[in-house]
């Protein structure tokens, strides 16, 4: 039986191998000097909070790196929250840390850590929509939030990766237009599914840009 440290190291290794198969993985992750959980923020499974950058000729991917770490304490029979989240966007030159795309995936990752068992809700509903604060895009709601839909499937790489204890989902976070968000808020489950289907039909379903035409 593997020790916790061996499970942790193996999970990190397998996640890195997965992203290296998708594109060029930046050698350094983005992480805090002081862990936000020490200042009252959400606690990630192994405490470690990091983000990986993956570059392809056509897109840049920014992904959480740690939501699927094995839990440091308690039940270690599964890989953390059973998921990582990512944003896919047009190529970004240099550091991604000060971009709205990073803000989007950062807020999503913190929400996943705070809520805990989001993966079960995704398995039940397929898609989830939510709103985030502190994402610096030109269009926001009157509440100062942006809308996003979680769970649109990638057609260019696998949506799951097998780690040391189980398979975990790589969950896309896609920025919504105000019209799309409003339609979902007005129409509930039916509206969410319709917008998801329209986004898939539009093409580049997992890509987040500010220039994309609204499907509503």
Task: Go through each PLM region and give its residues.
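Acidic, proline/glycine-rich low-complexity IDRs
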Residues: 1-63, 67-70, 74-80, 86-216
């Amino acid at each position: 039986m593997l020790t916790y440290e061996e499970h942790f190291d193996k999970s990190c290794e397998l996640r890195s191998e997965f992203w290296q198969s998708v594109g060029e993985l930046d050698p350094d992750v983005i992480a805090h000097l002081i862990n936000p959980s020490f200042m009252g923020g959400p606690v990630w499974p192994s405490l470690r909070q990091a983000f990986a950058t993956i570059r392809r000729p056509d897109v840049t991917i920014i992904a959480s790196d740690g939501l699927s770490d094995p839990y440091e304490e308690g039940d270690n029979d599964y890989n953390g929250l059973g998921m990582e989240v990512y944003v896919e966007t047009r190529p970004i030159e240099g550091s991604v840390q000060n971009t709205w795309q990073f803000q989007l995936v950062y807020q999503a990752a913190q929400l996943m850590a705070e809520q805990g068992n989001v993966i079960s809700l995704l398995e039940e509903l397929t898609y989830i929509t939510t709103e985030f604060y502190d994402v610096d895009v030109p269009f926001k709601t009157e509440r100062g939030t942006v809308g996003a839909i979680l769970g649109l499937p990638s057609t260019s790489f696998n949506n799951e990766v097998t780690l040391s204890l189980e398979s975990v989902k790589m969950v896309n976070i896609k920025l919504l237009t105000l019209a799309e968000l409003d339609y979902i808020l007005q129409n509930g489950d039916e509206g969410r599914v319709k917008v998801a289907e329209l986004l898939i039909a539009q093409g580049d379903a997992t890509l987040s840009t500010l220039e994309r035409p609204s499907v509503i």
